[in-house]
Each structure stands twice: as C-alpha cells, then as structure tokens.
C-alpha cells in the first residue's frame, strides 16, 4: 500500500497503523449517537472496549465488566487540553463520536470550474450556464480527457482532506463520464480510493446526470443506453452500489427517471435521486415509491412527497454548500420534514461546480445557520442519518457494541463545538476499522508506533 502526502499533513498507511484494541477510557459520549450497554450518566466518564477491531462493550467506565479490565488502556480523560478548544476543567472526559459519514459527493473529476464561479458572480445563472454547454458538461469534457491514474491522483487529496476531519465512510458518484468507458473509469477510481485509504466507499452510478453532447436532442436514446448497456455492464463488474440520477428540467424527466429506476430494480440495486433542486417535478415521490435510500437537495418538495418519503424510510439529504454557492432562494422545507419524522442527513456534495467544499463540519454549521437545523439534527445528519442514506446503518454512524471500531476523539468541551467553530480543524484522534490512523491527542504510549501526531 502506498503512502500519500496530502495538504492536510496526514501521511499514513493503515497497514502500519497500530491496532486500537484495548480500553478507551475517560470519554464523553453523545447519547444520541451512542447505543450503550449500560445507561450513560452525564457526569461520569465512559469507556469503549475494542477487540479484534470491533467494539465489544460501550458504557460507564465504573461499570466496565471485569473480563475486560486487564486489557491495554488508552486513557483520554486528560488528553484534551484546556483553553480555547480544550476540555473544560472538571469535564467527565474527552469527547468521542462515531466517525463521520459524507453521504453525497462527486469526488472524482477532472479540471475545475472557477470560471463559472466568476460568471455567476457577474449574474449568470446555474441553468443558463448548463444550457450554454457549461456546468456538468464542462466537467465531463475534463474528466473524459483525464486518465484513470490522473483522476486518482486528483481525487486523493480531496478524500484525504475529508478523512483528516474524521470522515470514516463516504459516497462517491460517477456522472462526469456519460459514456461507458468514462463512467467505468470514475467508478474504478472510487474503488481504488477506498482500497488505498482503507475507508468505506459506497459508489453511486450517476450515468443519467446530464445529456452528453453526442446525444443532444436524443434524450430517450441516451436513457436506453444507460439502462440497457452502461448500468448492466458496470453492475456486472461490481462497480455499482447504488443508482442515482438527476430529475430536473435541465436534466431528465420523471418518465426517464422511472425507466432508470426500473433498470436498477431488475439488477437488485438500490436507488437515490437528485430531486427538487430547481423545481418540483415529482421526483422525490417517485423515488420513495421505489424505496430510495435518499432524495438529495429538496429545495422544492411537496407535502405528498414528504409523506411518501416518511413511509418509505427515505432519507432527506441536505446540501447547504450547493444552496449557498448557487445563492439559493428557497430552502428545503425543514419544518415539514421534521414534523413528518423524515430523517435528515447533511453532506458536502463536493463537486467542481456548485459545491467545491471539503469540510463536512462546515456543512453541518451551514445546515444549522442557513437551513435552521438544530445542533442534534446536524450531528445526526453527519453520522447516524448519513449512514442510513448509504445503507450503512448497521455498521456506521453510531457507537455501539458489535460494530467495527470507527470513532473519533475531539479536543472540545462539548459536541456543539463540532458545529460551532468555523474553519477549525481539531487535532483529533481517529480510529478507523479498528486501527489508530491519527493520534492528534497523543494517547498512544508507544511513540515509536507509526501514527501521525500533531506536527508530524
């Protein structure tokens, strides 16, 4: 496995990172993000037991079963420094959360679209740029021109920036190839990224993202190609975990969306949908009828669609970065989603056009300030509900016994600070897949172990 230098300063190889097996003591757990074996008192430290890379016990430190008492200890109680970003004096321990989950990204692409940013600042609309051959199609041209290795090299620092912030699972879409060989290239890069960084990657085939220029005026022919050739071939090669598409007036119709969903259903693949970003075409209600994992964007959403999503258990994925960048005027109907009990996730939507964002914590902050989520909703949105949006609810997004050890320790006084600070990158300790891939809090008692500490 190759070591990777990144702008974040991380330089690690999971194969060299030490195992996290032992007792992680002196912790403060977030009740909403934890399934404990015993009730968690608010004023007493908690403990996690890791064995074989799995969480074996979660609960109050004072009630730790004797069978685990002889295990190696990682004492985090005094690890978080006092001060502006440190633990409060007398706090019961160091804050611990599940590893974060970024459930909507377009991480693999060529080029960038800073020129369009300048045009939008001068008054051009997202739709006008797309209709003029820019937007998604500009990224298609750059992505088609890049080799697989070039796309991998471009995507690696983007992924590493998210991992350094505590992300432990991520979705990566295709959709900038719009031809079999180029969609395959994107999805292969996504798989390689997951293997190289030993991070959980869920791929989404987004072949119906936009109409490629060679199919101008022949939308139905292209959808037939997607359903009859591209999707079956990519699924057979094991490159597709879910099927996504863009149902919008500048993209594809409701009937075309259903055709793609039927093709996915025949292959046993779950679906998700870019829906209601610019207008309400009924896509969210349709996606819910097909049991979609998620509907994403949702600025324009009817009451009937909300009811359908609730009944289907479909997650509403909020993308404040895109709304902010495109100067959105209509917010997603948060109150109605909340009242209906629809789970809400938050994601970066990292892409070169509408959301060049590489901080999931910043997106959580924006979801609160721009969309009026509560702090607890935002935290669940980047952990528990985000995992559900990827079908990973049984393995990610929650600290619980029986799950892989994927958690983060933060030098913060309270969980609200994860959402509160702007642009702050806490020196966290990260455990992923049962190994300590970063020890920003300096908890390891064997300094010769090859784990990055601050300044390394």
From Swiss-Prot:
Residues annotated for Zn(2+) binding in this entry: 104, 106, 274, 349
Gene Ontology terms, MF aspect: imidazolonepropionase activity; iron ion binding; zinc ion binding
Classification via InterPro entries: Amidohydro-rel, HutI, Metal-dep_hydrolase_composite, Metal_Hydrolase
Primary residence: cytoplasm
BP GO annotations: L-histidine catabolic process to glutamate and formamide; L-histidine catabolic process to glutamate and formate
Known catalytic reactions: 4-imidazolone-5-propanoate + H2O = N-formimidoyl-L-glutamate
Cofactor note: Binds 1 zinc or iron ion per subunit.
Key words of the record: Cytoplasm, Histidine metabolism, Hydrolase, Iron, Metal-binding, Zinc
Top-level division of the source organism's lineage: Bacteria
SUPFAM superfamilies: Composite domain of metallo-dependent hydrolases, Metallo-dependent hydrolases
Subcellular locations according to the entry: Cytoplasm
Keyword check for Lipoprotein: no
UniProt binding sites for N-formimidoyl-L-glutamate: 176, 351, 353
Similarity-based family: Belongs to the metallo-dependent hydrolases superfamily. HutI family.
Pathway(s) served: Amino-acid degradation; L-histidine degradation into L-glutamate; N-formimidoyl-L-glutamate from L-histidine: step 3/3
Taxonomic lineage: Bacteria, Pseudomonadati, Pseudomonadota, Betaproteobacteria, Burkholderiales
GO CC terms, sorted: cytoplasm
Keyword Transferase: no
UniProt binding sites for 4-imidazolone-5-propanoate: 113, 176, 209, 277, 354
Descriptive protein name: Imidazolonepropionase
Top enzyme class: hydrolase
Enzyme Commission number(s): 3.5.2.7
Function: Catalyzes the hydrolytic cleavage of the carbon-nitrogen bond in imidazolone-5-propanoate to yield N-formimidoyl-L-glutamate. It is the third step in the universal histidine degradation pathway.
UniProt xrefs under Pfam families: Amidohydro_1
Binding-site residues, Fe(3+): 104, 106, 274, 349
Cofactor(s) needed: Zn(2+); Fe(3+)
